[in-house]
């Protein structure tokens, strides 16, 4: 079973990897995410919910300004945080991304990860958005496998990463202060998740398909 605080830490790590954030932005975002879960009925310490629902980015967008306003930062810093964090979260509630992240008729985890599904990101041009989508998908896959894995049985599911160099590009994971190496952090996060699931022996196969393997990270 995945503890809700463990899930939140993974989610914040994904945002920190994919969005340029500096100073206390990750801490403010984490505080807002935790409050969103509490508003949805979650007991964070016990990892229990009396309603069995999860907050959406709409819920996060509602609490972010309040969390920033309650902080002890200067007015200029608060204004910067509202502009940076709220604008980015709002972009996940509009257009096609709103349909992906906030749809009420979304596929269940069982349908997404146990059935025959193709996730086509070929038309997502922005690297930050593509990294965020893949990061959340891999996080959901990892948590789903950790909760439903059957050890040492027959092969049950195959996950294929086509043109894997777009996700596992050979690059440095180092970053300088107050900047984010989007590709490096995303590669590191994805590789660690795949490695963890492989070690867990959950009867799943991960196949990397790429015409140029020399461009892949090790």
Model-derived regions, located:
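P-loop NTPase motor domains
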Residues: 1-217
């Amino acid at each position: 079973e995945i503890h809700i605080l463990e899930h939140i830490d993974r989610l914040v790590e994904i945002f920190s990897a994919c969005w340029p954030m500096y100073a206390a932005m990750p801490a403010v975002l984490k505080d807002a995410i935790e409050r969103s879960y509490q508003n949805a009925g979650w007991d964070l310490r016990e990892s229990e919910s009396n309603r069995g629902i999860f907050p959406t980015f709409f819920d996060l967008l509602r609490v972010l300004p309040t969390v920033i306003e309650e902080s002890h930062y200067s007015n200029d810093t608060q204004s910067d945080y509202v502009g940076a964090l709220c604008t980015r979260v709002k972009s996940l509630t509009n257009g096609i991304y709103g349909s992906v992240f906030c749809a009420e008729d979304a596929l269940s985890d069982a349908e997404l990860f146990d059935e025959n599904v193709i996730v086509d990101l070929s038309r997502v041009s922005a690297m930050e958005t593509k990294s965020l989508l893949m990061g959340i998908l891999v996080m959901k896959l990892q948590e789903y496998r950790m909760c439903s894995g059957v050890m040492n049985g027959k092969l049950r599911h195959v996950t294929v990463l086509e043109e894997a160099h777009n996700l596992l590009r050979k690059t440095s994971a180092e970053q300088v202060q107050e900047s984010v190496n989007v590709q490096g952090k995303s590669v590191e996060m994805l590789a660690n998740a795949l490695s963890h699931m492989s070690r867990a022996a959950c009867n799943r196969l991960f196949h990397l398909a790429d015409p140029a393997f020399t461009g892949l990270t090790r």
